[in-house]
């Protein structure tokens, strides 16, 4: 595991980013090994993965300065990892719930807890899909844009590959179906799922929400947004809504990638 420094002084962040970029470029260009890089600072919280421009910029800073040459040299291969059960779903719902009320501050050891939970928790079925490599012509299509827009567009190219490669499990369709009913609309996609699959997902959601409510109460965070008059049932409903979007958003992402 490679640690990426994000919260130090600008000079230290640049120095460590340059070292990391040089290492990655050397390993790939020399053929010694491939490097796996997460798109964001941890897996996305709401189930909608978007590539991080900062990571793409970090990858180029060790190059020659020519966008096309530098990015082609990295031989990028987008990869989609789809879990039947998101291992940190309850923790993510809890974090989003709190962040709606005030800026979220991580507690000591929270990252380690998330890593251990992500490794050890039940995930059900898992599919890892390696997409087609990013083609030179796709990189070339970004070169006429401004410096910042190049990375935005390249990120979109990567995202389309990943979103198209998502494996959508019954849980995704069930969550979308429940959300559509709650919001009074038609589901984005209709997929017949078995009654046992529905029951399993609902039991899983109830268990995770129970854990989140217990933790939020212990931390004094199970409370309405400032100025709102919300009952405990309303707050639980909000947590469920957040949880359901974590599972339903990959459907939206896959549809927009077509």
Mark where each language-model region is.
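Membrane-interfacial terminal anchoring regions of lipid-handling membrane enzymes
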Residues: 15-35, 42-258
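Membrane-interfacial amphipathic helices and adjacent loop/beta segments
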Residues: 1-19
């Amino acid at each position: 595991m490679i640690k990426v420094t994000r919260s130090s002084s600008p000079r230290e962040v640049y120095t460590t980013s340059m070292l990391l970029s040089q290492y990655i470029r050397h390993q790939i260009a020399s053929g010694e090994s491939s490097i796996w890089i997460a798109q964001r600072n941890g897996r996305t919280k709401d189930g909608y993965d978007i590539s991080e421009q900062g990571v793409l910029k970090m990858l180029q800073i060790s190059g020659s300065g020519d966008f096309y040459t530098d990015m082609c040299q990295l031989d990028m291969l987008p990869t989609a990892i789809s879990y039947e059960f998101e291992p940190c779903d309850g923790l993510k719902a809890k974090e989003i719930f709190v962040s709606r009320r005030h800026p979220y501050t991580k507690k000591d050891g929270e990252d380690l807890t998330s890593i251990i939970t992500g490794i050890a928790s039940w995930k059900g079925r898992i599919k890892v899909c390696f997409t087609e490599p990013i083609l030179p012509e796709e990189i070339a299509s970004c070169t006429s844009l401004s410096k910042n827009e190049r990375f935005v567009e390249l990120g979109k190219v990567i995202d389309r590959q990943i979103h198209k490669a998502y494996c959508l499990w019954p849980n995704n369709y069930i969550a979308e179906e429940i959300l559509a009913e709650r919001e009074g609309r038609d589901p984005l996609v209709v997929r017949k799922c078995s009654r046992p699959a529905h029951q399993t997902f609902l039991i899983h959601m109830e268990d995770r929400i129970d854990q989140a409510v217990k933790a939020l109460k212990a931390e004094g965070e199970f409370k309405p947004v400032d100025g709102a008059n919300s009952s405990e049932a309303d707050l639980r409903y909000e947590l469920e809504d957040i949880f359901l979007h974590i599972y339903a958003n990959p459907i939206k992402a896959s549809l927009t990638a077509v």
